[in-house]
Amino acid sequence: MFQRRKLFSRASAMVALSTAFVAGWFKSDARAQGGYTVNQQAMIDLFQKHVDAEMKGDLETTMATMNDNPHLNHVPTMAGGVGREGVRAFYRDHLVGKFFPPDVKMASISRTVGDTQVVEELAISFTHTTAIDWLLPGVAPTGKSVEMAVAVIVGFKDGKISHEHIYWDQAGVLVQVGLLDPKGLPVSGAESARKVVDPTLPARKI
C-alpha cells in the first residue's frame, strides 16, 4: 500500500536548507498528515537520520543506516558505489560534508511511501560556487545559479537502507552552468524545475 503526501505546491514554499530543516522535514510531514504504518514511519525516520548524518559530515552514522550490501547510484552521472566499501569510499571522498554549496535551498514536493521504499520528489536550487562531484564531476565551479528537480528512490531491507537511486535532468543542469547550448535542442533550463514546483506555469509549445 502506497501513501503519497503533497508537501509544497508553490515556489514560495522553498526554504533554506539547514541541518535542523533536514532533520525535521520527514517527521513533520508524517506526524502532520498521519496514516503511516509503523514500518513506513521507521523507514522515514531512518532516512531522516541518514540525510542528517550526510549534512553533518558524519560518515560513521551515515554508513550505520545502510545494510551490509548497499549501492548508491546518481543515475545521470553514474556516480556512486557498490557494496559497503564502495559506498563508504564514495561518501568519504565525494559526498559527506560536500553535498551542496552553502547557499543551497530545498523543498520537498511530494513523498510516496511503500512497504520497502520511500520516494522523495524535491526542488533544489544553489549557486555553483564549489565542486559537486556527484552532480558535475570534473567541472570547476562556474558561479552560475542552478535550479533542479530531483527524485530520490530509497530502498530498505532488513531494517536498513539497501540502496539510493537519484534522478534529475542533467541536460537542464548543463544548460544552466553554461556547458550546453539549448538552441535547437529539446531541453530546458531552470524553467523545467520551476514547473515541477508550480504546475500552473505554461507548458512548452510544440
Model segments located where?
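C-terminal and inter-domain tail/linker signature
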Residues: 2, 10-18, 25, 31-206
